Amino acid sequence: MGSIGFIGGGLMATAMIKGLLQQGYPATEILVSDPDPKRREILGALHVLPFQDNQEMLWELGKREGEGVVLAVKPQVVKEALAGLTFPFLPVLSIVAGYSLAALARLLPAEVRILRAMPNTPALVGAGITALSAGAKCGEADQKWAEKVLGSLGKVVIVPERLMNAVTGLSGSGPGFVYFLLEALIDGGVLAGLPRPLARELAVQTAAGSIKMLQELQEHTVDYARQELA
């Protein structure tokens, strides 16, 4: 296994790192740069190699048999994070929301092979679904590498980039709608006299069981709704 470098060590990057470690990826082959000392302390506890400076991390990655770089910073700091960086000849996988392949290409050296991904919040517990789009310069090996890394967060689907905005609206924002629906069910149970912990357990397991039925039986969603209302 080669080394992987992370620019940004926030929650999603940390979830990816934990997933990789659980899959047996060596901690000493994971390099992470983040300016926040608290994040570096958290990352250090995972026995990966934390760096304060992005370029220093990339230089170290370049000395190794590197596999790729994951860009995992907030959208508002992308330009600052990438300014003036020299990259090793490796693919760059971006999980930055709202940044297209073309926008990233304007910020990165011309020779960099770029991939774009959109994970969702259930990825934080290894149960997410991530859409992946590869740039024109990427080869099959680059995409396979990205799929491996993103697989640490859950399921991965390949989509053309023109569909990424639709993906963002559905699976990217979708968990928020599910959480609000569950909160309404829980509140309804409380209003009907249930203790909140019991109402929460009932609502969450009802949702989990319903989703498992959809996954395993493959029938149309509305068919189940009609069965429940019959």
Across the structure, where does each feature detected by a protein language model lie?
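A structural micro-motif
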Residues: 2, 28, 48-49, 90-91, ...
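Rossmann-like NAD(P)(H) cofactor-binding subdomain of soluble oxidoreductases
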Residues: 54, 58-132
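Glycine/serine-rich anion-binding loops at beta->alpha junctions
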Residues: 118-123, 168-178
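Internal alpha-helical scaffold of NAD(P)-dependent oxidoreductase catalytic cores
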Residues: 103-113, 129-167, 178-220
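NAD(P)+-binding Rossmann beta1-loop-alpha1 motif at the extreme N-terminus of oxidoreductases
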Residues: 1-59, 64, 127, 190-192
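Short pre-catalytic strand/loop immediately N-terminal to key active-site residues, enriched for Gly-Thr
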Residues: 4, 164-169, 225-227
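Small-residue helix-packing motif on alpha-helices
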Residues: 30, 40, 57, 195-203, ...
